[in-house]
Structure formats: C-alpha cells, structure tokens
C-alpha cells in the first residue's frame, strides 16, 4: 500500500470516533481484525465501475453523468464487524449491507444472529439514499470483492442485504450480480424488480427498475441463490414487496421466502425477524435442474426444491437429528407466513427421510394440523 493510501486510512481513523481502524491481512484466509472497526480499500473491482454496472443492468450510460457520480475507492470507508470466534481456520459467510442513511454499522441487536451464523458484516459508509444508485451498487460490490481477498470467506455464502432504499439496491445486486452474491439476498422493507408489475385491481403499477441479467447470471439467481423479502403489515412498501415476491415465484425462482411482520411499519425489523431471514439464507441448497417460465402463474412451486435442499443438508452433517431439526425450523418459517404448500413439501421430506428423529415426529403432527390449508 502506498504512503498516500496509508495517509488516507489514518484520516479516516481520526474521523471515525470510537471505532478501531485496522487492516486485515491482504491474503485471503488471514486472521484479520475482530470486533467492530473501519476499513478502506484501494483495489477497485472491475464489476464496480459505472460502465460495467450500466451494461449489466441495461441502463444508458452518459459520459458526463458518469464523471459526476463516480468515486475514488481509497476515499471511501466501510464498517466491518467480525465475530470474536473468527480465527481464519475455517470459512465464514459474508453479509454485505447497504443502508438508507450514511452510517454503515450493524444494529447492535443483530450481532447475535451474525455471530450465530458465522458471518462477517461489511457496509459502506456514505452510501445512503441521498447518493446515486450506481456508486451505491459499486461500493457494495467493492466491499464483497475486497473482503474475500482479506478474510477466509465461503464464496457460496456471500450475501447482499439492505434496508429501505438499501434493500432496493441489494435486490438489484442479488439478481443482477448473482455471480458475486452467490448466496443470495435479504431485502428488507424495500426491493426492485426487472419487470413492470400491476396491482391486482389493475389501478396501479410499479415500473421496471433494471433489465434481466445475462442468461448464466439469471439462471444462478433463480436456481442457486436464495432471496428473502421482508416487509410489515403497515409498511408503505408492503404491496410492492408482495407483488415482486409473486413475480419471483412466477418466474420460478426456486429458493424464496416472504416475511410479513405483524404490526410493523417502515422500520428495521427486530432481532427475531432478522434471524428468520438469515436462517433461511444459511440453509444449504442443492443445484436444481433448469427452470422455465410458465405461461400462467402456477398455484404452487416446484416440489423438488425442499427435497434438494434437504438432500444437500444431509451430506453436510453426520447427526441426522440435527439435520432434521434444522429443516424443521425452515419449515416453520413457511408456516409462520402461511406458505403452507412450501411448508408441507419440506415437512413430508423430513418424515420420509428422517424417520425416528424427534423432528420427524413433530413434522408428522404438523402435517395433520395443516391438512386442508
């Protein structure tokens, strides 16, 4: 790193009162710093440039406009949280976040879930709703790429998330850059879509925000990535979130979850609901066969999804009871949101493949309870 870059880092440290500035090891897998601190990066990713993002998202690119909204990466800063038990000996997941306001630190009540799922948090500062969308997207991409070179990260567990306007940014990255955010995304009280959607009464519509990405990327987003949509009963974006979730379902996205928090408005969800989203993202999945868009909206999703996920999970653990318990928790997420067909699919798989475990017995009882729903 050059002296000039180091000077910039020191300046950031002075400005970030109360936070610890530290460089993680340059090589992937380094132990790095733990706890909460601020980082800067000097190596900009090719995918974060204005031209690359505009091309990937199907947006026009005006040279004079690009110059106005572009950024110099060493001048930017990122808030990082690394769980205390990270040693660099095993791979962690990476949760790349985008806020609607200038700060990038994680809410304190989310840290337990981040620790539990062995995730590292990174979020750009000064990337709120008052900034153009392309640099916001670029900074999130730069965070994802640079953190993977500094920490031991599982590339299949790189997730993107955000709240409100940050959720909209995350939702575009989760689909448009599924080759980077291979684990998928968690879109909280805000999301965008690649197609215009009309409300059920036909009186309103929500315009398309971006274009479908290249076929290989789009297939990965539909078949391999997971996508969580979280809204609240009183969230102003609830209707749009519901429409877009149904659009994902229509287009055969195989691993999707809709969470609607009772009584919640346009605000951060509490720790319990944040944990529900992370739990779904972190459940292992297997690659399914190619999907095609139907001519009419299907009444149910494909029955192979839960079976594939369960099969993959079973290969990752030796304790059958533990695996069955994890799958039962996932089924409960569907039940909590009245997604009975998806829940039934997963419960049946548990009963058939984990006979003799407490979770199988509980799954059988639950199937009786939801019969006919």
For the regions a protein language model found, what residue spans apply to each?
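Alpha-helical segment of the N-proximal tetratricopeptide repeat
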Residues: 322-349, 353
């Amino acid at each position: 790193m050059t002296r000039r870059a180091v000077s910039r880092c020191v300046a950031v440290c002075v400005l970030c009162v109360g936070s610890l500035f530290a460089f993680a090891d340059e090589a992937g897998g380094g132990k790095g710093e733990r706890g909460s601190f601020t980082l800067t990066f000097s190596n900009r990713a090719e995918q974060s440039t204005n031209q690359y993002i505009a091309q990937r998202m199907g947006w026009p690119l005006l040279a004079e406009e690009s110059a106005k909204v572009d950024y110099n990466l060493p001048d930017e800063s990122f808030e990082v949280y690394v769980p205390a038990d990270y040693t660099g000996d095993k791979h962690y997941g990476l949760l790349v976040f985008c806020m609607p306001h200038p700060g990038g630190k994680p809410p304190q009540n989310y840290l337990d879930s981040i620790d539990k799922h062995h995730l590292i948090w990174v979020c750009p500062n000064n990337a709120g709703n008052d900034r153009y969308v392309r640099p916001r997207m670029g900074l999130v991409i730069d965070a994802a790429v640079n953190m993977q070179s500094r920490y031991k990260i599982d590339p299949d567990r790189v997730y993107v998330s955000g709240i409100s306007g940050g959720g909209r940014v995350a939702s575009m990255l989760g689909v448009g850059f599924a080759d980077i955010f291979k684990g998928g995304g968690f879109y909280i009280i805000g999301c965008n879509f690649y197609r215009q959607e009309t409300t059920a009464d036909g009186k309103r519509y929500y315009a398309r925000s971006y274009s479908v990405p290249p076929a290989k990327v789009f297939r990965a987003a539909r078949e391999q990535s997971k996508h969580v949509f979280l809204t609240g009963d009183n969230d102003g974006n609830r209707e749009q979130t519901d429409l877009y979730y149904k659009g994902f379902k229509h287009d055969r996205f195989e691993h999707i979850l809709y969470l609607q928090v009772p009584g919640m408005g346009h605000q951060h969800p509490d720790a319990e609901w944040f944990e529900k989203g992370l739990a779904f993202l972190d459940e292992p999945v297997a690659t399914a066969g190619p999907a095609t868009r139907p001519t009419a909206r299907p009444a149910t999703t494909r029955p192979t999804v839960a079976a594939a996920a369960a099969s993959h999970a079973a290969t990752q653990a030796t304790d059958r009871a533990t695996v069955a318990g994890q799958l039962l928790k996932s089924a409960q997420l569907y039940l909590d949101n009245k997604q009975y067909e998806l829940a039934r699919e997963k419960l049946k798989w548990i009963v058939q493949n984990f006979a003799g475990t407490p979770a199988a017995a509980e799954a059988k009882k639950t199937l009786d309870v939801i019969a006919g729903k």
